[in-house]
């Protein structure tokens, strides 16, 4: 006893009885004011970054294609002309890929015009037509010439000045551009030095994007056909998640016992299987000394030492679990009782189950704001125009300086007939552009900090609501009328700074992990094993640190919700309280994890199986109203339903997990504060009192306050 008391003293003294304490303290003050001010100033700066991005950014360069003058196709004056036609796409096809299409607008050294539709038939200017006028030759193809070209201009002049195309190829629109189709059964004049082979080679890289578009259309069609049934599947997931949590008060004990026995049975079968494999390979198998080290991991399946090592590991795990069942059965019973009480708390405050919707909306706002800001920052800059000549050997164009900046609105006073002022891209100069990297870093920091703050807000609000349930002596009579909304207002009013403090600590660790992941990605091709090993060790350490900080923050927010102290004091008190009851913490954590994992498996697996049999048409006789839709890819709505079910189950079970953690801390505080006397009665339910062998004294001449 003396040794245990000394260990407890090392982690602080037990909580003292406070006659005025009746659950979450209402008379509290603002905490971590400096962090609150810092967070608000940072948010103001984040808004300023968004305004700068809005002023200087132009996302149209990603969303819409541009012609040679830099005008956007599909908007403004070109609203009815959504596609770009390249007079000679082969001059830039070799440098085209999907990324450059999106980022650079596919600016190539060839004239580009906005068109209402892409060419459908092949066509070429014949030699005898060069002396005719544009109005006569391009009668049916004026849409493919520069709008400003005069119909009285000679065709030869229009070709030299790059005002009209010399040939047209059957094309298909993709990503807002007209890309030639492959296998064209058409022979072009030899002077153009273009043939079908050249066309096929030049645009082969673009066909992937065209095929991707066809796939995207099919995917859209599948969603249009199956969206209703996907919503039905998500509704089933919601009902299953809610039923699982509400039924835990009835089936928690047998379910936990069944899961533990199931784990023991799986380990026992693993031991048996490893023994069988080891016995077969003991006399005729290859030993580890004979095989040595090899990168072919499948080769180790025929090594007897592999199965022997697996057998030993599984046997140790089996033994540890059996010893835990024998010596920690009392703590397992406490964990089961807390799970039942958590189910009861959720049933009393059903509004808490839908709080994840608030968190989801706030996360969408945070992520959406960052994404829009990052897009506008990436597309900031003034348009740049340079002089360009189609053929510098043309008389009068030999001495023209190309790639020199110009003004597209100024008249071209030059002896070169082919001289153009062409759009090339956006500048990287200017205050916003020079600070682009720093602004993007600021935005990433803002993303992590705001997301972690929103998650912290949800945890603290739920903790306040569930704490008010536990510390209500007569349930449900003493539970506040609106526990969730009261906790929400209380948290925002007093503890924004504390949440920002905890979120900032977690953000810094996550940013460090991102930097390490980036360095590891850069070193992936490196042959230096020492550097790779060091990076791997740092990544492992930061992963463990992040997990620990998340655990500490979660319990700190519970203490903040109950007592209204600042972050550091709350984190210290929570840590000391948990360390004084470390065995109970481990048992409850593992039992809860096992139960929630089974719940997720049940919900996601059930929805997945039902979706598979329905969308694949394996369920017959459902009637006309329940006929499965005709789909191109039936796995698409199945995967969507499974992922949606996982998100819904995670949202519901995260609330339940927070409830268990909150009730557990309140239970530990209850044990330390109270002794069951009339002056200091326990607040825990009768099931926990019975397990612990404790009881509340009955007042003389009256009934026990405890129901």
UniProtKB/Swiss-Prot annotation:
It is found in: Membrane; Apical cell membrane. The keyword Cell cycle does not apply. Highly expressed in intestine, kidney and stomach. Also expressed in testis and lung. GO terms for cellular component: apical plasma membrane; plasma membrane. Choline transporter that plays a role in the choline-acetylcholine system and is required to the efferent innervation of hair cells in the olivocochlear bundle for the maintenance of physiological function of outer hair cells and the protection of hair cells from acoustic injury. Also described as a thiamine pyrophosphate transporter in colon, may mediate the absorption of microbiota-generated thiamine pyrophosphate and contribute to host thiamine (vitamin B1) homeostasis. Belongs to the CTL (choline transporter-like) family. N-glycosylated; N-glycosylation of Asn-67 and Asn-391 is required for a proper thiamine pyrophosphate uptake. Keywords: Antiport, Cell membrane, Glycoprotein, Membrane, Transmembrane, Transmembrane helix, Transport. It catalyses: choline(out) + n H(+)(in) = choline(in) + n H(+)(out); thiamine diphosphate(out) = thiamine diphosphate(in). The gene is Slc44a4. One of its GO terms (molecular function) is choline transmembrane transporter activity. InterPro entries: Choline_transptr-like (IPR007603). The chain crosses the membrane at residues 33-53, 228-248, 251-271, 308-328, 357-377, 453-473, 499-519, 558-578, 595-615, 636-656. This is Choline transporter-like protein 4.
């Amino acid at each position: 006893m003396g040794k245990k008391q000394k260990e407890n003293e090392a982690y602080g003294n037990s909580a003292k009885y406070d006659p005025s304490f009746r659950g979450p303290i209402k008379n509290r003050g603002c905490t971590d004011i400096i962090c609150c001010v810092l967070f608000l100033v940072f948010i103001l700066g984040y808004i300023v970054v968004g305004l700068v991005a809005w002023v200087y950014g132009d996302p149209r360069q990603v969303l819409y294609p541009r012609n040679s003058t830099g005008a956007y196709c599909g908007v403004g004056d070109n609203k009815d002309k959504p596609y770009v036609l390249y007079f000679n796409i082969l001059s830039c096809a070799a440098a085209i890929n999907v990324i450059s299409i999106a980022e650079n607008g596919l600016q190539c050294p060839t004239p580009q015009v906005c068109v209402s539709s892409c060419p459908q038939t092949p066509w070429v200017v014949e030699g005898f037509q060069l002396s005719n006028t544009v109005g006569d030759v391009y009668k049916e193809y004026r849409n493919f010439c520069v709008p400003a070209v005069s119909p009285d201009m000679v065709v030869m002049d229009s070709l030299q000045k790059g005002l009209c195309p010399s040939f047209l190829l059957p094309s298909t629109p993709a990503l807002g551009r007209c890309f030639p189709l492959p296998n064209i059964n058409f022979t072009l004049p030899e002077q153009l030095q273009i043939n079908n082979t050249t066309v096929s080679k030049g645009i082969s890289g673009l066909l992937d994007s065209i095929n991707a578009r066809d796939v995207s259309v099919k995917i859209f069609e599948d969603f249009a056909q199956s969206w209703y049934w996907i919503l039905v599947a998500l509704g089933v997931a919601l009902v299953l998640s809610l039923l699982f949590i509400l039924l835990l008060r009835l089936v928690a004990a047998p379910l936990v016992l069944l899961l533990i026995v199931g784990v023991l049975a799986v380990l026992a079968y693993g031991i048996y299987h490893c023994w069988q494999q080891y016995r077969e390979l003991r006399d005729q198998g290859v030993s580890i000394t004979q095989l040595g080290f090899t990168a072919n991991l499948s080769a180790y399946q025929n090594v007897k030492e592999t199965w022997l090592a697996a057998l030993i590991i599984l046997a140790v795990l089996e033994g540890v679990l059996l010893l835990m069942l024998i010596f920690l059965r009392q703590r397992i019973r406490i964990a089961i009782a807390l799970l039942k009480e958590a189910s009861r708390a959720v049933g009393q405050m059903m509004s808490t189950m839908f709080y994840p919707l608030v968190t989801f909306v706030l996360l969408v706002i945070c992520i959406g704001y960052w994404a829009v800001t990052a897009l506008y920052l990436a597309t900031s800059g003034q348009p740049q125009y340079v002089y360009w000549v189609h053929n510098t050997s043309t008389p009068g164009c030999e001495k023209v300086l190309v790639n020199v900046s110009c003004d597209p609105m100024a008249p071209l006073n030059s002896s070169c007939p082919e001289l153009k002022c062409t759009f090339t891209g956006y500048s990287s100069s200017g205050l916003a552009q020079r600070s682009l990297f720093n602004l993007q870093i600021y935005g990433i920091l803002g993303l992590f900090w705001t997301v972690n703050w929103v998650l912290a807000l949800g945890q603290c609000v739920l903790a306040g609501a569930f704490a008010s349930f536990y510390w209500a002596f007569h349930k449900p009579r003493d539970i506040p009328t609106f526990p969730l909304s009261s906790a929400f207002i209380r948290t925002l009013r007093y503890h924004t700074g504390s949440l920002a403090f905890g979120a900032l600590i977690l953000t810094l660790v996550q940013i460090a992990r991102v930097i390490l992941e980036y360095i590891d990605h850069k070193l992936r091709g490196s042959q230096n094993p020492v550097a790779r090993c060091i990076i791997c060790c740092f990544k492992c350490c930061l992963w463990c640190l992040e997990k620990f900080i998340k655990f500490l923050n979660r319990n700190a927010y519970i203490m903040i919700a109950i007592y209204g102290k600042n972050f550091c004091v709350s984190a210290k008190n929570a840590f000391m309280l948990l360390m004084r009851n470390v065995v109970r913490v481990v048992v409850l954590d593992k039992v809860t994890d096992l139960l929630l994992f089974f719940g997720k498996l049940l919900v996601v697996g059930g929805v997945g199986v039902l979706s598979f049999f329905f969308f694949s048409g394996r369920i017959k006789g459902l009637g006309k109203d329940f006929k499965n839709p005709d789909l191109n890819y039936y796995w698409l709505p199945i995967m969507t339903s499974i992922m949606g079910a996982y998100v819904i189950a995670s949202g519901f079970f995260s609330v339940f997990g927070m409830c268990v953690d909150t009730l557990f801390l309140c239970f530990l505080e209850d044990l330390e504060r109270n002794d069951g006397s009339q002056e200091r009665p326990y607040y825990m339910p009768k099931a926990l009192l019975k397990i612990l062998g404790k009881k509340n004294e009955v007042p003389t001449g009256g009934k026990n306050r405890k129901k």
